[in-house]
């Protein structure tokens, strides 16, 4: 039965590297809000909120901005409030 199994054992398999050899290492993203010691994210501060919005008007995800989960929730609610108050657009046209 074991003779029919042609799959190699773990010790026989070549090791795969997760990062391509010779490629640059990615720099860890820094939480902009925590780095600048911003305690309250105000919906009226559109200059700050525009950093977290794409050119199409969508909210950028955490993996792009590098914010923590807690600060991402605060940013999201502030952006949504600013949109309702017409301080930020829901979508932008090209």
UniProtKB/Swiss-Prot annotation:
Q: Name one GO molecular function term.
A: structural constituent of ribosome
UniProt keyword terms in alphabetical order: Ribonucleoprotein, Ribosomal protein, RNA-binding, rRNA-binding
Positions with biased composition (Low complexity): 1-12
Cystine crosslinks: none
Spell out the Gene3D superfamilies in the cross-references.
Answer: Ribosomal protein S18
Q: Where is this region: Disordered?
A: 1-29
Top-rank lineage group of the source organism: Bacteria
Q: Which GO terms describe its cellular component?
A: cytosolic small ribosomal subunit
What SUPFAM superfamilies does this protein map onto? Ribosomal protein S18 (SSF46911)
The Gene Ontology biological process terms listed for this entry are: translation
Record's subunit section? Part of the 30S ribosomal subunit. Forms a tight heterodimer with protein bS6.
Family stated for the protein in its record: Belongs to the bacterial ribosomal protein bS18 family.
Q: What is the designated name of this protein?
A: Small ribosomal subunit protein bS18
Q: What is the lineage of its organism?
A: Bacteria, Bacillati, Bacillota, Bacilli, Lactobacillales
User: Gene encoding this polypeptide?
Assistant: rpsR
């Amino acid at each position: 039965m074991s003779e029919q199994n042609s799959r190699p054992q773990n010790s026989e398999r070549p090791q795969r590297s997760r990062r391509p050899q010779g490629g640059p290492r990615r720099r860890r993203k820094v939480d902009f809000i925590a780095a600048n010691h911003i305690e309250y994210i105000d919906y009226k501060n559109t200059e700050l909120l525009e950093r977290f919005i794409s050119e199409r008007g969508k909210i950028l995800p955490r993996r792009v901005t590098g914010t923590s989960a807690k600060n991402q929730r605060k940013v999201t609610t502030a952006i949504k409030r600013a949109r309702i108050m017409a301080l930020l657009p829901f979508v932008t046209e090209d």
